[in-house]
């Protein structure tokens, strides 16, 4: 454990916090084993406690601004769908940056708050090899296929899909 230089009370609090972090990490690992979750290493820390909890996963990544939730969403016809923070080119950070420039941060957050229901209720459309779209009347969610039957949300567009 790293040495913390502070008052005795601060040192005690720091040690307690480190123990809590270790317990949380062990809990996440246990969830991954029980649910057979295989997070993609390139996306960093997996918040396994939000498995199949799209709304919770979204909130967690908005707070942490890094990492992933493997299996944040699930559809019977697709299986698990991962939500990753990503960077400026893909993932949740890309979606927020793009929508914040288009509108403002508040409206961008409101827009992505509908991600869970749009994934559940949208129509599947194959866009190109390795990419699938989930479309609703107002939005298009782009999923990239990663590995064996893993889908990662890479974009969320506001489109008026009149053909649905």
Where in the sequence are the language-model features?
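Ribonuclease/tRNase effector modules and their secretory precursors
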Residues: 1-164
